[in-house]
Amino acid sequence: VKHAFIFAACGFAGLTACGDDPKTGANDVDATEEVAPEITPDVTLEEVEVDEEVARPTGPRANVYPVAPGVSPALVQVELKHLNEPNDTMTGAFAHVQSCSADLDRGKRSKLTFGPTTVEIVSCVPEQKVKPGADGTYLHIVPPATPAEDDGRFAEVMMYHHMQVIHDYFKDVYGLTERDHPLEALTNVATWIDRCETWAGVTNAAFVPALGLAFFVEGLDVTSLRGDAIIFSGTAERNFSFDASVIYHEYTHAMVGATRLSGTFVDNQGLNSLPGALNEAYADYFSATQTGEPTIGVYALTDLAASDFCGVTDDTAATENYARDLRAVRRCPDDLVSEVHSDSEIFSSALWAIREEFGARQADTIVLYAALELTDTSDFNAASDLTIQGANDLYGADVSAKVEAIFAARNLIGCDRIMPIDKVGSRDFELRVEGTRVFDPNPYPGYVPGYLQYGVVVPPGTKRAKITLDASAGGFASNGQPLEVDAVVKRGAEPVFYTYGLGAGSATNDGDYTFTIVDKAFVIQNPNNVPLAPGAWTFALHNKARRTLRISAITATFE
């Protein structure tokens, strides 16, 4: 969800066969078909089930929050579906849930080295704690007074139940069976750090593919995890497993994003991280449409206390909010920051607007139809085009036109990744240009371009333009080392385009000028004091150092 852990069918024809006529409105449904209840901001799926007598739990029962403490503070009674017989742990056909116990005697011990410093850490111990009561239910398990007092049992119950809710949504409504096997889930993750003398959790959760578990967190005991996993931590104030919106988000990564929309690729504008942003956008959207709440992490990601190496600090006044509100309209490229969670808000705001326009059922169908066609090299342009086409295929030209207008309002159709320099830093994020160590072999000759390029408007009569970067090389412990950066400048509003040949170092670009940045600045000036062409200019930054370049602001002065 947030980036603090050491972390990120029916088939298309069958989408229409699961309750939606491809050329009718959202409410035109065959009365003989079983239709899932419409989920609105005021009605959750659990509330629909509890309010209808025929849907009351008949199997193993438990108390859960429909969404999260403070969002839906009253507990509801639910059936824990798909549990294996004899129902003695949170293991079923589609989930294997454990919580992680803080136990210094049984925890796995290891050492981590950071330069001259070595610390010893002890992993928490994964185990299943939930057991049914004498009546065969789990109603005796209730939320702890505070997350700090949680023994793992309520976290396991919350996790298990909401995994079934989102699994059954994808399967029963849309026929997706990719997760028809037990997905691993681990709650309450924390580690003991000897220099801190405390158990430290983090404000995060993550979906981790099976192949990535060994590299996920050094020292974490993952031996009991038998495949892909969703892993949740938290603090004494926030247990991320208590927030259904976070569970749905991570489960959607497992369902929709596990085989597509991962990583970064190179294209004709440099490095493109937007597949990861789309992965986050779809995870946010399907979480929000399931809860009916357009903000992801109202409980888990709001008023988070400041943290450091040892966990939450004593500075209770230093809190931050990372909840993502899908109603907040953002635009490409002005709001891009080359961080996938933040960049995702541009696209997810469009998806939520589609839901507001057409309702949950019709919008979900349009959105999923497109998402299942995407690949690891799909970006905002591709996803917008596929969603518009999907709306046309499923519901006709009028619906498609409205979807296109929603994307156009956010400049998501044909958006070049050129950020106006006055927007750099506007979202309080440092922009990154990766170092050469990220590529081996490197397709670029001795440099790495950024995820973004930058636009500047030169006034008429300008003879000299000076571009200054507020930037640092290397980030943590950089010690003020000088930048090793070139600026490739191009006249006009088009991006600098890259072309790739065969082998390492074969990339070329169509920039007009290349300047070496000295003292964090470069100057554009014609010979003989000839004025520069007025209007839009574009430049790309090429990092020639091994470590990351971080940019807080870019300014321009004209003479």
Where would I find each of the regions flagged by the language model?
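Solvent-exposed serine/threonine-rich low-complexity stretches and specific carbohydrate-binding patches
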Residues: 498-514
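Enzyme catalytic cores with a strong preference for nitrogen-chemistry domains
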Residues: 453
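Zymogen propeptides/activation segments of proteases
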Residues: 18-247, 254-449, 464-466, 471-482, ...
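Short secondary-structure subsegments characteristic of cysteine-rich extracellular domains
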Residues: 9, 365-367, 511-513
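Sec-dependent N-terminal signal peptides
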Residues: 1-22
